[in-house]
Amino acid sequence: MDNTTNINTNERSSNTDFSSAPNIKGLNSHTQLQFDADSRVFVSDAMAKNSKQLLYAHIYNYLIKNNYWNSAAKFLSEADLPLSRINGSASGEKTSLNASLKQGLMDIASKGGIVSEDGLLPSKMLMDANDTFLLEWWEIFQSLFNGDLESGYQQDHNPLRERIIPILPANSKSNMPSHFSNLPPNVIPPTQNSFPVSEESFRPNGDGSNFNLNDPTNRNVSERFLSRTSGVYDKQNSANFTPDTAINSDIAGQQYATINLHKHFNDLQSPAQPQQSSQQQIQQPQRQPQHQQQQQQQQQQQQQQQQQQQQQQQTPYPIVNPQMVPHIPSENSHSTGLMPSVPPTNQQFNAQTQSSMFSDQQRFFQYQLHHQNQGQAPSFQQSQSGRFDDMNAMKMFFQQQALQQNSLQQNLGNQNYQSNTRNNTAEETTPTNDNNANGNSLLQEHIRARFNKMKTIPQQMKNQNTVANPVVSDITSQQQYMHMMMQRMAANQQLQNSAFPPDTNRIAPANNAMPLQPGNMGPPVIENPGMRQTNPSGQNPMINMQPLYQNVSSAMHAFAPQQQFHLPQHYKTNTSVPQNDSTSVFPLPNNNNNNNNNNNNNNNSNNSNNNNNNNNSNNTPTVSQPSSKRTSSSSTTPNITTTIQPKRKQRVGKTKTKESRKVAAAQKVMKSKKLEQNGDSAATNFINVTPKDSGGKGTVKVQNSNSQQQLNGSFSMDTETFDIFNIGDFSPDLMDS
């Protein structure tokens, strides 16, 4: 046995003689203890004072249990084992050995009664197992060192559990995203969990889906799709896999890319060829793309011609009337009336632009191309999107559309009109020189007719004479719309919601015959049908319209009557009407208003004329509108009765202003008397709005005849000097004030 080092004294042991009896001389050179005959000594882990003694006790127990006698005797003589002694007394008290025994072994040869037959001490362990605690403890440390944490019980009951393996190996150079960090190994890409990728070592089989495109080592992607065989693989030609980006959307570039794709796809499927043909194949790819380009271009041209011929056979061109289409001369057309069906040779007009164009555009372009090749038609350019780049072609196309619609409308009721039965004589006799002039004149007439339809409003009413509409030529679209709406109101046309039927013979009675119905601001109700008047209506008062503002570019383009503003008779009444009453209409004023129109058309501003007009106040129509907040708080609907007089000149002398005031006072007295005769209350409020005085201040006078308001809450406004339709340019802010 080899020389061993003494654990306690670090001395070399030269004794190699092992016998059944222990040595007489101890190796620890400590004082030999004298034991009693009744005492017994044994090795126990319960007496261990530190971890080293605990380990030694379990090692000694392992050697004895497995019959390693020589090793156990040598270990007992050298190691510091925890010893314990049991007295032979009846009490069985356990006593520990002397402190000197803790430092080394003792010579117990002279005490043969206390040792076993083999000269070894017995062991009594508190922590013990079938295979000794030391063996199980060692197996646990071995499993920890090897990374095998599962015991036999777990392996038997969890056979489907996968082993824990590291996700990122130490030799991996790939940049794996963060969302792959917690996935199981079967979900992770193979390159993330395998050896690093390099140009020479990795060639994926199949479609090449098991490599990372973002990997910096995988730069040449085109080589990944090519199989490295003995004679087929060519590294220089693999650069043609990606198309040239400088070509952009050119057809040649796309064809070149598709040629290379087909070539490489065939190389992938082709078997390996011997090395002798490798030199020939290196020279072939330089000639092959040009040859395939020519073949594919020829095939595409043939397909385009076939598609055009099929479209011409399925949808033949209709017969074209040269009068309808001025830009197609009849002498160049076919004898049967059909346009020449010659497939265009120019590649600008191909099958791609046909799908995005109308049939009329296709005909026009084919006509242009056909005559352009013959040198008869003017040249034009067409973009790839199929749109018109020539303004003349655009104008002619819209002229064709407008003329076709106009001719169809004119010949709709003519049964003898048959466009498909034209003969050669008719085409020859048709003049072709004035086609453009006729087309322009027809187009102008068509536009003029549309414009006249917008201006004219049909006045189809019973017992009403039509009045010539004014010619409005130099107004804007907004002014024309306002003019149309005012004419529609004047013509009493039917509303869109059909709430008021067009009955023109029903006219409302006078004001004193109808009581006022509170709570409804709608049109008046005609309760007594016997009181309806059937007087024929007079001239339309809304015809003579002039713009309110002299500046056309003003924000408000309103229209107002020139002199007098008349409304239908219904607005004179104070009665209300339900919403769904079929008897309520908007008739025109009576014939008795003609006198007022004749009087108001005079431009004389004499006081005598004003007096004459004011004396006929019974026939003067009034405007009834809801009152403002200054009126009384009665439950009835208050009205503002406004009597409109002709416009008066602004610059008047002092003497004339005094006379006009006297005349105004006389008019008020006359009005109050007439209101008393008609049955209304004599208490009437008069509001005078006078122009500025010589001092430059405007005055507003309010006079109360008896300081009482009328029963119906109406005011009589004297507007001799206050013309609401001729106050000039004003803004909405002034209107609010």
From Swiss-Prot:
Its source organism is Saccharomyces cerevisiae (strain YJM789)
* Protein's recorded name: Transcription activator MSS11
Give one GO biological process term.
regulation of biosynthetic process
Gene Ontology CC entries for this record? cytoplasm; nucleus
First-listed, main subcellular location of the protein, grouped into a coarse class: cytoplasm
Q: How does it assemble?
A: Interacts with FLO8, STE12 and TEC1.
PANTHER family for the chain: LISH DOMAIN-CONTAINING PROTEIN, TRANSCRIPTION ACTIVATOR MSS11
Q: Any idea what job this protein has?
A: Transcription factor that regulates pseudohyphal differentiation, invasive growth, floculation, adhesion and starch metabolism in response to nutrient availability.
